[in-house]
């Protein structure tokens, strides 16, 4: 709770996962708003492969260092990231990812993925993100295809994440868009 207020005010407004006062219902409502009111009815549904297990430690530290200057806090963060996992009866070092179930892990993921959120916002793309569930909403198929190319390039090249090409797709909301277990239609 000490670190969260440093980042929270500047997170992208369409980021909903693991944030105070926000929920999956809010994320669904925002997606419906973009589709129904603003006619952003071409939707990229992005799937990231093992997102939380593949967060790059150096990039995490770099993003935290932009706001936190206390070296002891950054050192603790690095120790947390590299604390390892139990496999059977022995401890294995972790070179990537954020420990599952860690108290600060959701914040780490949001800080990490906020770079993507802000990148897309700066280019005029409308997104809704709940943790690693990402929708990009566009007014045309060509716009959605462009957004997918831009997003995939940034996620893979800059954030070192993997977009699951077989599970990522573009759909029109007339056909329904599944998001957080709910199917959203144009009307």
Segments predicted by a language model, with ranges:
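Active-site substrate-recognition loop segments, prototypically the cytochrome P450 B′-helix/B-C loop
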Residues: 1-6, 18
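Conserved polymerase palm-domain catalytic core
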Residues: 10-178
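Active-site and adjacent loop segments of nucleotide-processing enzymes
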Residues: 178, 182-187
């Amino acid at each position: 709770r000490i670190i969260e207020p440093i980042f929270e005010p500047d997170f992208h407004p369409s980021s909903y996962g693991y944030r105070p006062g926000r929920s999956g219902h809010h994320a669904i409502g925002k997606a419906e708003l973009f589709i129904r009111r603003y006619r952003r009815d071409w939707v990229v549904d992005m799937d990231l492969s093992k997102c939380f297990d593949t967060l790059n430690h150096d990039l995490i530290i770099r993003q935290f260092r932009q706001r936190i200057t206390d070296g002891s806090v950054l050192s603790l963060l690095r120790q947390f990231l590299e604390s390892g996992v139990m496999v059977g009866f022995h401890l294995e070092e972790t070179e990537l990812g954020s420990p599952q179930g860690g108290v600060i892990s959701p914040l780490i993921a949001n800080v990490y993925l906020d770079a993507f959120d802000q990148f897309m916002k700066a280019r005029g793309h409308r997104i809704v993100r709940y943790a690693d569930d990402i929708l990009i909403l566009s007014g045309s198929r060509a716009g959605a295809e462009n957004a997918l190319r831009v997003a995939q390039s940034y996620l893979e090249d800059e954030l070192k994440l993997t977009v699951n090409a077989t599970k990522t797709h573009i759909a029109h909301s007339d056909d329904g868009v599944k998001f957080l277990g709910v199917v959203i239609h144009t009307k």
